[in-house]
């Protein structure tokens, strides 16, 4: 047995360590997911004015500040009793904020955080011996996804075309948010009861111009098939079978045109989505399309025991009407709330079934498995107790272990697409399950993220040009007495998954307790009080460290793929702790 540890896993967004035990066949037999720093925002918010939560919590993460700001605002809407009265145009503008932020985040993940692993030399060793076709596929992967300052065998590799093109698009999307939200990151226009800046006709016109420029990137790099044709035949398909058939027929046409010339370029019709859809999966690429090889990403990152996992979505994006239900019942939002079991059975979502365990975390809470509204954040203060190498029976992470009805929950694009029964992703999940694969794996997670990006690009156009009406009502007044001895819950969908904020106030209307359960905690969580591993840990156990080729303990590309397929954001999950006593408590400095 060989210990293989990846530390850090994350390219940005905090510090995450994965420690695994691997057998002689390269199969992972045990795993621990450790978040290496402590998040103290819940303690910072105590005794603050509740309205500050919408601004302070945005500092939890610079990638998805809007998600935290919107979730906090949702909690404040309920705290002040105005959720049912928030004007339609305010809700539509919140949709635009979040949609732009999610597209920007997904593009960053696909091209900058996950994509570079497709240029890993492990794939060169597997593909180039397959002759001209294999070499052409490898050259295409390297030419699209190689990161900046990349070397292989001592030679400098030019940065990939898709990688480089995505970076200015991220900037453009940030500028779009700043135009209507005040600034990005850390927008200043969120407020309970609505939002603060009435976007003008000129703003909407400029936003539309930006949108067309972003869609130019999509057509040049991401999807080479006509965008509306893709949406009509996948997102709007009448059944999962029809969506999958459309994609496989489209890929078959591309293969028939490309195999004789070995041209898998964008100019030959291979957008990044088409390329990964064909070559990323053993089932799709090799068994359905007859390709000589694939990356076999559908063979790693799955769940061995479906009874120990579920797929949780809180629901996101308001319907264009006045008011909303803060508890997010099924059907209340465009992306509905829900729970899908590991066997793909659909269940009703109940926020009262959410708890957090600290049995394997660095906390000295008085009670385990607390609901978030009663949650505690009492960290270890003895540095001798903070050890990451004690194994699965020890306490080994700063992350808590959220559970839904006692079960570990995967959150994020795959969970959202399954819960809304999106035809393409649902069809792929069903096909994989029918053929003996886990319906959740690296391949389906990444395709779900790509598909969600396309769906949001489609929905954004409608929100910007149809649903939002300049000059409409954007806020309602607050009764500050309503926030005394009160509670609020904000349930929302961040790019990486279900995000919840819970707030309680005292008789003076100040924050008495504040708790966040973030996607990174759901996904990267350690074991719970029953010893059940978190989603990432479960997906590692039973998977190979190298999905293709020989076992290579020094280049465990499978671990990279599995960990990064969840788009881990440890900045949200954890922050920092001072064990020296040099920093005065309750001192907050905003730079």
From Swiss-Prot:
Ni(2+) binds at residues 61, 64, 569, 572. It is a peripheral membrane protein. Mg(2+) binds at residues 42, 575. It is found in: Cell membrane. Its cofactor is Ni(2+); Fe cation. Fe cation binds at residues 64, 572. Its EC number is 1.12.98.3. Keywords: Cell membrane, Iron, Magnesium, Membrane, Metal-binding, Methanogenesis, Nickel, Oxidoreductase. One of its GO terms (molecular function) is Methanosarcina-phenazine hydrogenase activity. It catalyses: methanophenazine + H2 = dihydromethanophenazine. InterPro entries: Ni-dep_hyd_lsu (IPR001501), Ni-dep_hyd_lsu_Ni_BS (IPR018194), NiFe-Hase_large (IPR029014), NiFe/NiFeSe_hydrgnase_LSU (IPR050867). One of its GO terms (biological process) is methanogenesis. It holds the Pfam family NiFeSe_Hases. Induction: Expressed in methanol-grown cells. It comes from the Archaea. One of its GO terms (cellular component) is plasma membrane. Gene3D superfamilies: Cytochrome-c3 Hydrogenase, chain B. Signal peptide: none annotated. Part of the F420 non-reducing hydrogenase II complex that catalyzes the reduction of methanophenazine to dihydromethanophenazine. Belongs to the [NiFe]/[NiFeSe] hydrogenase large subunit family. Composed of a large subunit (VhtA), a small subunit (VhtG) and a cytochrome subunit (VhtC). This is F420 non-reducing hydrogenase II large subunit. It comes from Methanosarcina mazei (strain ATCC BAA-159 / DSM 3647 / Goe1 / Go1 / JCM 11833 / OCM 88). The gene is vhtA.
């Amino acid at each position: 047995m060989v210990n293989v540890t990846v530390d850090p896993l994350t390219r940005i967004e905090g510090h995450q360590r994965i420690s695994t035990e691997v057998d002689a066949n390269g199969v992972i037999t045990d795993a621990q997911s450790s978040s290496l720093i402590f998040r103290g925002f819940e303690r910072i918010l105590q005794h603050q004015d509740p309205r500050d939560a919408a601004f302070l919590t945005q500092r939890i993460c610079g990638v998805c500040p809007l998600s935290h700001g919107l979730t906090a605002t949702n909690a404040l809407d309920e705290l002040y009793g105005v959720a049912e009265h928030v004007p339609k145009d305010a809700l539509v503008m919140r949709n635009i904020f979040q949609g732009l932020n999610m597209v920007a985040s997904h593009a960053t993940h696909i091209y900058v955080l996950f994509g570079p692993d497709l240029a890993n030399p492990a794939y060169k060793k597997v593909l180039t011996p397959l002759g001209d076709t294999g070499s052409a596929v490898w050259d295409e992967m390297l030419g699209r996804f190689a990161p900046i300052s990349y070397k292989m065998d001592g030679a400098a590799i030019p940065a990939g075309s898709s990688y480089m093109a995505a970076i200015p698009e991220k900037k453009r999307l940030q500028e779009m948010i700043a135009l209507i939200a005040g600034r990005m990151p850390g927008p200043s226009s969120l407020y309970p009861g609505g939002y603060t800046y009435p976007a003008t006709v000129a703003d909407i016109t400029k936003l539309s111009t930006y949108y067309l420029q972003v869609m130019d990137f999509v057509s040049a790099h991401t999807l080479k098939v006509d965008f509306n044709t893709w949406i009509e035949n996948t997102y709007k398909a009448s059944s999962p079978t029809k969506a999958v058939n459309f994609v496989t027929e489209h890929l078959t046409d591309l293969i028939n045109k490309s195999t004789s010339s070995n041209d898998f370029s964008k100019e030959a019709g291979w957008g990044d989505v088409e390329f990964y859809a064909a070559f990323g999966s053993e089932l799709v690429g090799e068994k359905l399309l007859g390709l000589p090889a694939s990356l076999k990403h559908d063979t790693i990152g799955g769940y061995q025991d479906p009874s120990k996992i579920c797929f949780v979505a809180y629901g996101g994006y308001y319907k264009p009407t006045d008011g909303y239900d803060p508890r997010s019942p099924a059907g209340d939002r465009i992306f509905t709330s829900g729970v899908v079991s590991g066997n793909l059975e659909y269940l009703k979502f109940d926020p009262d079934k959410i708890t957090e365990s600290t049995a394997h975390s660095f906390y000295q809470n008085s009670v385990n498995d607390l609901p978030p509204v009663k949650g505690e954040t009492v960290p270890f203060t003895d540095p001798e107790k903070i050890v990451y190498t004690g194994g699965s029976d020890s306490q080994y992470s700063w992350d808590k272990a959220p559970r839904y009805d006692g079960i570990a929950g995967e959150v994020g694009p795959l969970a959202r697409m399954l819960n809304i029964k999106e035809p393409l992703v649902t069809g792929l999940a069903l096909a994989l399950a029918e053929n003996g694969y886990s319906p959740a794996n690296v391949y389906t997670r990444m395709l779900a993220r790509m598909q969600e990006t396309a769906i949001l690009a489609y929905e954004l156009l409608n929100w910007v040009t149809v649903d939002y009406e300049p000059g409409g009502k954007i806020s309602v007044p607050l009764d500050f007495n309503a926030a005394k001895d009160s509670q609020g819950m904000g349930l929302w969908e961040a790019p990486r998954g279900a995000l919840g904020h819970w707030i309680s106030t005292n008789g003076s209307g100040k924050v008495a307790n504040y708790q966040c359960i973030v996607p990174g905690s759901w996904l990267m969580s350690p074991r719970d009080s029953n010893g059940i591993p978190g989603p990432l840990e479960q997906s590692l156990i039973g998977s190979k460290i190298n999905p293709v080729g020989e076992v290579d303990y020094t280049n465990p590309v499978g671990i990279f793929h599995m960990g990064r397929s969840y788009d881990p954001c440890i900045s949200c999950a954890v922050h920092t702790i001072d064990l020296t006593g040099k920093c005065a408590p309750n001192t907050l400095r905003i730079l």
